[in-house]
Amino acid sequence: MKPGPNWNYEKGVREQADWDNHARFVDDLFDRGLIMLAGPFVPEGAGALVILNVETAEEARALYANDPWAHRDILLLAEAKEWTIFLDAHGRLMK
């Protein structure tokens, strides 16, 4: 994720315009089991990383096209890549 042209660098993440709607959107994805990890980079305003539990990069793009912040050009999907996990937190090989 990368800041869009309407990101306000004078404000923190939770102070950006339409934060409540963006937070509800992200919470819904999390509640549906679609977000595995997510959070902003440091320093604030440097973008964010989101790891989704989806099958394709296209599915990730389609999901984030509905983000209220994407509609307002506040935070945009910079790149979507498909990723194969070989090791989990316990060091086991994933298949």
For each feature predicted by the language model, list its residue ranges:
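Conserved, structured core segments of small domains
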Residues: 1-95
